[in-house]
């Protein structure tokens, strides 16, 4: 699993770079997981409500899978094993969440700021 720094690099490679060659499912999954974490953070901080870890992880896994689908379709990545990339993205998203909030009782936007890598 990747930490925030490497996951952010994967996100940038997938979402911003004009890739000439083929992306691996690991890079795609890492980028999708990072973007899912960013989307989750943005939404939860806007709402300002604490949520249980199980719910947060469930939401993140759904967002990560949706991001993989979106990327495969919009970037013409038909050669990617979509289901493998989704599973990897879900695990990576859970890992990022655990790294940032796993030591807390629940996700509470009032108790801890977002990871600095997601400030863009």
Task: Identify the residue ranges that each predicted region occupies.
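N-terminal leader-region detector that preferentially activates on the first domain or presequence
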Residues: 1-27, 35-57, 67-120
């Amino acid at each position: 699993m990747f930490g925030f720094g490497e996951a952010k690099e994967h996100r940038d490679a997938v979402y911003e770079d004009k890739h000439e060659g083929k992306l691996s499912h690991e890079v795609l999954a890492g980028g999708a997981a990072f973007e899912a974490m960013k989307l989750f953070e943005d939404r939860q901080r806007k709402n300002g409500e604490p949520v249980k870890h199980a719910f947060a992880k469930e939401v993140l896994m759904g967002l990560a899978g949706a991001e993989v689908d979106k990327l495969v379709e919009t970037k013409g990545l038909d050669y990617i094993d979509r289901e493998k990339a989704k599973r990897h993205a879900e695990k990576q998203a859970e890992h990022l969440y655990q790294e940032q909030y796993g030591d807390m009782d629940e996700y509470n936007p009032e108790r801890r700021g977002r990871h600095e890598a997601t400030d863009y």
